[in-house]
């Protein structure tokens, strides 16, 4: 069974390579420039994307602690971090749109041949993005307008949608490393199973790595901001409290 599975994987990867090679006519004229542009765009987007995944959970946790303990500093931090989250979400939406356009323009051969296989995760990611945007708007607008409990609950879909959005996008990248969910006959794709493509062997490790990295990036960045402030002499509770919260998140991870 193991030998058969390995053989199937090798055949699938060989078929992928052949089809991509056959699509060379629509490949970028300068692959090095195309790769450089894609790498630069992704390098910028991934930083904002990590914050977009990890920061909602941190903001929601701080607000929950504020409601539970009655500490006004928690509420103040949650409100200010939420504003920063709104800006980061807008920047991430723009940078993510650029990456998606580059994927279709620079590597149109891949998408033309395999769009039916890996199109579903991008579609689901789009739905998750809109859900995240809608509830983030409610969350930001709902300060002092919704009850504390309703406002806290309005942030839950933001956290869930952000995690799902990242996981489904990563599954498309994982499929490139472990392609499955289709059969090539006569140079054409038949028997396409998008869910099999999404749930390929590389999706679990890559998605786990991505999500943990997102929370770690968020924790380290938030802790460093207030650590710098404390080094400059601001050692009041407002600066001490947030410097400990990200450390707690990192310790849990």
Each predicted region: which residue ranges?
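Polytopic transmembrane helical bundles with strong interfacial aromatic enrichment
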Residues: 2-5, 10-253
């Amino acid at each position: 069974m193991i030998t058969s599975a390995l053989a199937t994987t090798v055949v699938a990867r060989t078929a992928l390579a052949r089809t991509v090679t056959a699509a060379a006519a629509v490949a970028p004229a300068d692959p090095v420039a195309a790769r450089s542009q894609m790498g630069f765009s992704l390098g910028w987007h991934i930083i904002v994307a990590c914050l977009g995944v990890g920061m909602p959970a941190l903001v929601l946790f701080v607000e929950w602690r504020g409601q539970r303990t009655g500490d006004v500093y928690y509420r103040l931090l949650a409100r200010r971090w939420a504003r920063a989250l709104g800006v980061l979400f807008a920047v991430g939406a723009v940078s993510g749109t650029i990456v998606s356009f580059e994927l279709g323009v620079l590597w149109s051969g891949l998408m033309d041949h395999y769009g039916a296989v890996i199109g579903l995760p991008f579609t689901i990611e789009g739905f998750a993005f809109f859900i995240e945007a809608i509830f983030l708007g409610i969350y930001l607008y709902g300060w002092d307008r919704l009850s504390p409990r309703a406002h806290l609950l309005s942030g839950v879909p933001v956290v869930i949608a952000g995690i799902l959005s990242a996981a489904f996008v990563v599954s498309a990248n994982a499929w490139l490393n472990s392609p499955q969910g289709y059969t090539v006959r006569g140079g054409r794709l038949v028997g396409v199973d998008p869910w099999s493509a999404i749930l390929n062997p590389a999706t679990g490790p890559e998605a786990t790595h991505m999500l943990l990295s997102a929370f770690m990036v968020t924790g380290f960045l938030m802790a460093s901001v207030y650590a710098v402030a404390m080094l400059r002499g601001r050692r009041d509770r407002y600066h001490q409290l947030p410097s400990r919260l990200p450390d707690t998140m990192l310790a849990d991870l």
